[in-house]
Amino acid sequence: MQLTPEIQEEINQVRQNCGYFFMEGWSILSANGKDTLSFLQTQTTNDALQLQVGQGQSSAITDRQARLITSFSLHRMDENESWLLSDNSKTLHDHLESYHFREDVAFETLNLDLLALQGPKSMLILEKVFSSLPEKPNGIERHDFEGAPLTVIKKSLTGEEGFIICLPSELKENFTQKLVNAETQSTKIGEQAREVLRVEAGIPIFGKDMDGKNILPETGLEHSSVSYNKGCYIGQEVIARIKTYGAPNFALMGVTIEGPISPPMNGSILLGDKKIGIIKSSARSESLDKLIALAYLQKDHRSPDVEMDVSINERPFKIKTCLLPFYQASTRKEHSKKLLNEALQIYKEQENLDNPIAILREAIDIYPKHAEAYEALGVFLAKQDKLDEAIALMKRLTEINPQEIMAHTNLSVYYMKQGRIEDAENEKAEATALQFEQAVEKSMAKKMKKKEAEQRKKEM
């Protein structure tokens, strides 16, 4: 199973930049009324009553045996309305209505298009359109675009930072064009690339990796979608008992597979004559240079990093168990550092500073506290005689971190180049004072540590 160059480029775009796609098959179910949260509290596995306006959570619905009916995310819009985001909306709607009697809550599937932006630069792209964005996973914000309401949900579908824009159909074309113009460098991501990204991120989907035959603790959803402190809901007793007394017999985890042949979906994994698991979604991961798969494994075979020679539907395979996710996204700080290193490498190889400067601006946008990126950008701007901009940059850094010695040192140098002797001397004095204060603090901390060690030695 080899990926085409086009598919791999789409994957790289999401991992390094930003990709977009419309979420066909997904929809928003609105629940509205003064009893909305109290009703959902009795039906769902997570603690709906803890949600504040603008917050969200992953959740699920189970039957009395804790078998999964569906999974979704819940988002509190205002005092009375919440949204349920699901790729199984009809089942979700039908179930809730079947338990809905006198409660003041009305359900409606909204006519909205769902546009996903995924990747480390998705936030930067959306910040050009919206004044603010939700900061926490499943957080939600309402905005206006061309006089019409839009809603933004923070949600990763690929393992990277990502957002979902919920927009009326009439805005679909104009909004998409605004987001994907040449300046944003955002690429449309096809279904095959999305599947690889999803499997690498270890994200199971209902109907493929889990269904009504699975009890919820088998799926891994108990880590994100279950509150063990809330009141009663359907299936709670079984879920709580499994947590208290042991682990499910089978549970979802990752396996890597040697060789070029992908295992069949739902293929039985046999170790000798014993069935120890079942294969679910699989994909070719170029970042790992391996075939990877989600699989339900029997509890005696769920230790990570264990290699096994097995047969899957009577074909021999060599597999290795691993914890999910296969891929761990970089933090904003880590991504900013990569961009800094990229800019410095380009600077070594070419004289033109425009490209490194653009990359460093991007690094600072992604992680505004990255002092080394500020320093490098200030140096490059000074080399282009853009001293006013370099000074403004260092002042911004002193506002972010008043204890940053390097910012005051550079300001002193830049002021001196402009002939602003008094300002230069003041910044030099500030840098010297900070350096002295930090040296004193370091010395005192060292003495305190030594004193504590001596005290512990006396007490022995």
Where in the sequence are the language-model features?
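Structural signature of tandem alpha-helical TPR/SEL1-like repeats
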Residues: 349-361, 384-396, 418-432, 451-457
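Glycine-rich, acidic
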Residues: 2-11, 104-252, 256, 325, ...
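Glycine-rich, small/acidic residue-mixed loop/short-helix segments
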Residues: 64-68, 72, 214, 219-226, ...
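Acidic, proline/glycine-enriched N-terminal capping motif
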Residues: 1-69, 76
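Alpha-helical segment of the N-proximal tetratricopeptide repeat
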Residues: 332-366
